[in-house]
Structure formats: structure tokens, C-alpha cells
Amino acid sequence: MNTLPLDEDSCYEACAGREHAWDGHFVLAVTSTGIYCRPSCPARLPRRENCRFFVSAAAAVAAGFRACRRCRPDRLPGEMGWSRREDLVGRVVQAIRDGVVDDLGVAGLSERLGVGVRQLNRIFREEVGATIHQVNRTRRAHTARMLMDHTDWRLGEIALAAGFGSIRQFNDVMRAEFGTSPRGLRRYPEPETARGGSGRIRLTVRLPASGMQAATAMRAALAAHAVPGVEKFESGTLTRLVNTPAGAALARTDVMGRVELDLPALGALAPTLGAVRRWLALDADTATADALLSRDPQLAQLVAERPGLRVPGVVDGAEFAFFTVLGQQISLAAARTVQERFITSHGRPAPGLGEQWRLPPEPAAVAEVGENGLRESLRLTRSKAATLHALAIELAGELRVDPWTDRGETRSRLLGIRGIGAWTTEFIAMRGLGDPDACPSGDLVLQRALGLATSRQVLARAEAWRPWRSRAVMHLWTKESYL
């Protein structure tokens, strides 16, 4: 099964109209040429009988098609629509985007999801039209193509950085994806790559992104919450520390898709790119969300003023959960102060990056400090120290805060911690879980913006926004300058 967002005739009509809004939702494959394209491809529309439609680029490649060199579907954000799905297949797609398959393998992923490998592969293939390995292979190929566009690296370096196990595998996959060898794809642009004297790797890339018209609001939201030690906002640019299995990396961005990377090794590239895409919500389906929210009289003007507004994600889910608890019921300025104190007191050195950067502490290390130690080092109330300690114990155990976890189970675990209520849980869901339909209905600023008095009234009002309640909340918070 290849579950398309439209019936095939409607897909063809969208391609005939070259509708950019459908880019990333499906691809058009042409049997007479053997290529697949984005729906908005400017090439002449093929005859209907020569068209096939696939829900993902990987499914088209698995069926024997290669990427169009004119519309470059590999430059699109990842397949959209998956972020609002919390079923098993949606969670696997999110995990592939985050590089989890490279890290754990399919067997490790299936264990984390609590599903047998064969069952997981079968369900995924029926829904997506390609195997987990094939979708992950397509992700690697698109990363490699991006590096060819932006660096002068040797092909062997590109293969390693993109996650390929060998040059032969790299050559075979690139030929299957693009119809030619890696050498045939090379254009040798003006390089934006440098190697520091410390052996670190620096390069600039432009990541595919959808709807960046509201980048100013996104930048303001991230800047307002930037915590020294792990983040820095300076001259309109955000810099973020990323912890990878290969070491500590830095990502500097204008949030428009341009990213300057400072890497400890080639192996840090893929996890850093995944973290940045998640942090900036670059795969968000902004067009579909805007279309639905624009129907609401109270939101229509806000959407018109900030089309494409996204809800920021996070780089480190455990860190974000700690920060959210530390920021409960205090001002934003006070929250940043105690969050910085947390990083300074309990964070770890970031090798190769200087003293201004600190890796966030592992949950087990925070749990080891104990309630009294946290209360004294962070100057917390007894109740907040107890909540932070209980959260650390859960995070050191089975609690996960990431976009590919079970959202319902994570919410239940969070609500089971004394001191964590609905607002904290929904805020963590909005950003840490990447849930597009989270709704912190008890938020006083949200209630004021809507002119409502109770959480129940907000929930009733927000029913019309499903499955994009998080985006609606972001619009209302931005309107109220509550970032």
C-alpha cells in the first residue's frame, strides 16, 4: 500500500497546476522517462497514463525511479504530514529523520518501540511503499547530494559524513537515487568549508525548509529562551551546542535554513543536521496548517501577518524537560538565570569548544545529586527540587522526550511526577515531542488572548484548530509577545 494524501486523479491535477503546497506530500513518477519529480516541477506535464504517484521519494526509488535534475526533489524538506501522526509509522519516519536508524539500527529501533523487527518492517512498507532501510538510504543520499552542492570534500569524506558504510555502497545508492555516479553529480561550487588547526571541520550548508516567511518571529522565540552555555544569540544569529556520539558540535543559523557548522569529526555531521532540522522545525507542514487556521476569524489575521509560523523544536529533549520545570511559575528572566545556573553547576565541558560552552548533564548525574544538592546548588524551593529530582530519575529510566516516542505514554509519565501538571506536560509535548496538536489550555496568556476564563473553554474553542493546535497557540503567544 502507498497511502497518498489525495486520490491519484487529484494528485495529477495538483501537478497540472504546479501547486507548491503539495511539494513534500507526494512525488510524481514518470514511467516513460524513469524519473520522479516534485508536484511543482516546471517540466512539461506527462500524459496521465505515464504517471505514478508515491508518498515518499524512497518509495519512488524502490520502484526504480531516479530524482529529476531539473526540480531537484532531493532539495525538499523531509516528507510532510508525518509530524502530525502519532501512530507507529509516523514515529518511525521521525526516528529516521533524527538519524536513529544510523545509531541503533532497525533492530534497536524496534526494541525501543516495543515491536518485533518483522512486524515493524511489514507495517512500515505497507504504509510508505518502501522499507525502513530504503527510506534511511534515501535520507543519506540527499545528505550526500547537499554536501556535493556546498563543499569541496573528497567523495570518500562525503560518503562517510552522510553515513554510508563503504564507497561501493555510496556509489550504488547514488546511482540508484540520481541515475549517475557521484562523480557525475559533482559541480565543484565555491567551497564554504574549512578545517581548523584543532582538526575541527567547519562548513556552511543550506537546509531545505518550507515556508520561512515568519522567520523573524521564530528567531525571536528562540532568542528569548536562549540559555548561555548551550545557546547564544548575537547579531541576529543563533548558535546552538549539539552533543553527538562523535563529540560536541556547534550550529550557527539565521533560522532561514542557512547553517554554519563547527564539527569535531565527519561522523558528527548527520546527527547535527538532524538536531538542527528538529530545533528549527524545518520539516513542518506550514501550508496545510495555515490553510486550516485561516478559516478561524480570530486567527485569520494572525496567519496573514505571519504565514508559515512554526513551533520551535528542541535539540536535547531531557535538557528541555529540565529547563521547563526550572522555569515553572517564574518570569522568563528568572527562568533563564536558574537554567544557566543549572548548566554552569551541573553541565560538562564541551571538548574543543572553549569554556563558554557546557554540555547539559546526563539525567543519571542529576539524579545522583539528590534533592538537597539540587536545592542548594540551584537555590530552588524544596518542592521544585523534589520535582526536578523525580524528573531526573524518570529520564534516567524509561522516560524519553523526543519526536518519535509514544506521545500518550510520555504525557502519562510526566503527569505522574509530583509537581508536573498539564501546562508543563503540554509545553514539553509542543516542543520536545514535536506534537502539532498540543494545547496548554490552562495558560493564562492564552486565555487572555482568546478572551476566555477557563481551561475547559479554551479546549472547546481549540477543537476547530485540530490537528494544529500547537501552531494556533504559537500565533496567539506571538501576538501577546509571550515568547
Q: Where does each model-flagged region fall?
A:
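HhH-family (HhH-GPD) DNA N-glycosylase catalytic core used in base-excision repair
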Residues: M1-L483
